[in-house]
Amino acid sequence: MYQKEISPSKQYIIKINRGEEILTTLTKFCQDNQIFSGSLLGIGAAGEIDLAHYSVATKQYSKQTFTGEHEVTSLTGIITDKKIHIHATIANNQFQTFAGHLNRMVISGACEIHLLAGAESIGRLLDDETGLELLAL
């Protein structure tokens, strides 16, 4: 285990509008506000969602696209200087849930985010063993 203590800087409550793509919107927000570390939580509703699942064994992602109305029951993410890494859980109108790494999500109703920004910058480094860009602590 590795850890790094960071000081909280600011907290934001963010409303992402209908038709906006969440990663694009949050990336711009973080760039505009010079946020290079932090975490986020959120909920909402989306109509276009691309999720992925990573296999450590093959070092490849499998991907699936979901369309139509879906509740976004959970968004959790880590913000670093290189990217925003979010995992999402969504539910369809049959109450089936799907979860994974978020590649794309277009909001269809609303999206509400609580973002906790860190005062320091956190980076990522490629880990050869897993094939993932992991936190550089």
Give the role of each language-model region:
Residues 1-85, 89-137:
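N-terminal intrinsically disordered, cationic/polar leader segments
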